Amino acid sequence: MSVLSDKSIRKLAVEQSMISPFIDKQVRDGKISYGLSSFGYDARVGDEFKIFHNVNSSIVDPKEFSSDNFVTKKSSDYIIIPPNSFALGTTIEVFKIPRDIMCIVVGKSTYARTGIIVNVTPIESEFFGTVTLEFSNTTPLPAKIYANEGVAQFLFLKGDQSPETSYADRKGKYMGQTGVTLPKV
C-alpha cells in the first residue's frame, strides 16, 4: 500500500468526485486548518452534533442503542463537550472512495494537544457518504469543537490491487449516510 500525495488526491477529487466539496489548498485564516495537504485531506466538521448525556444512569449498548442517550445541538460557531464526555459530528465533505483505495482518519494535533481525541474507523473501498466523527473529551474541563473548521486528516491508501469484495458489494450498513449517524447492527 502507498499513501496518496496531494497530486493524486486532487486528481481523484476532480476526476472521480472522491471529495465534495473539495478545497484545493490548506485554508487557515484564523481557523483550524482544512483542505488539501501534502499527503492527506483535512476534513471539516459540520454544524450538527449529538452529545452524550446520562439519562437515568442508562447503559450504553451498541446492539440496543437508544438515541435518547444523546442531545442534538446545532451551532454555526462551536459546541461544548462536557468533561470526560463524548459527542458525534459529521463531515461537511461527502466521500466517494474508489475501489482500489481505503482511507484512515487521524485527529488533528490542534485538538489532540487539548485533550480532544477524534476517532473514525477505516473507510473501506467504494464507501459513499458523509463520515460520522467521534469526539472524546479526555479532560476534566468542558471543551470546544468548532463547527465548519478542520477536525481530522484523511489519509488515502492505494492497495496493491482492487479487493475481491468492496464495502458497496457487501452493502455496508453505513453506505450513503448523511448527517450524524448512530450505531447500527
From Swiss-Prot:
Pathway assignment: Pyrimidine metabolism; dUMP biosynthesis; dUMP from dCTP (dUTP route): step 1/2
Stretches that traverse the bilayer: none
Pfam annotation, one family: DCD
InterPro entries: dCTP_deaminase, dUTPase-like_sf, dUTPase_trimeric
E.C. number: 3.5.4.13
Swiss-Prot/TrEMBL keywords: Hydrolase, Nucleotide metabolism, Nucleotide-binding
Reactions the enzyme catalyzes: dCTP + H2O + H(+) = dUTP + NH4(+)
GO BP field: dUMP biosynthetic process; dUTP biosynthetic process
Keyword Metal-binding: no
Active site: 134
Signal peptide start-end: none
Residues binding dCTP, per UniProt: 108-113, 132-134, 153, 167, 177
Highest taxon, organism lineage: Bacteria
An MF annotation (GO) of this entry: dCTP deaminase activity
Biological role: Catalyzes the deamination of dCTP to dUTP.
Family note: Belongs to the dCTP deaminase family.
Subunit structure: Homotrimer.
HAMAP family registered for this protein in UniProt: dCTP_deaminase
Protein name, UniProt field: dCTP deaminase
The organism of origin for this protein: Pelagibacter ubique (strain HTCC1062)
Lineage, opening ranks: Bacteria, Pseudomonadati, Pseudomonadota, Alphaproteobacteria, Candidatus Pelagibacterales
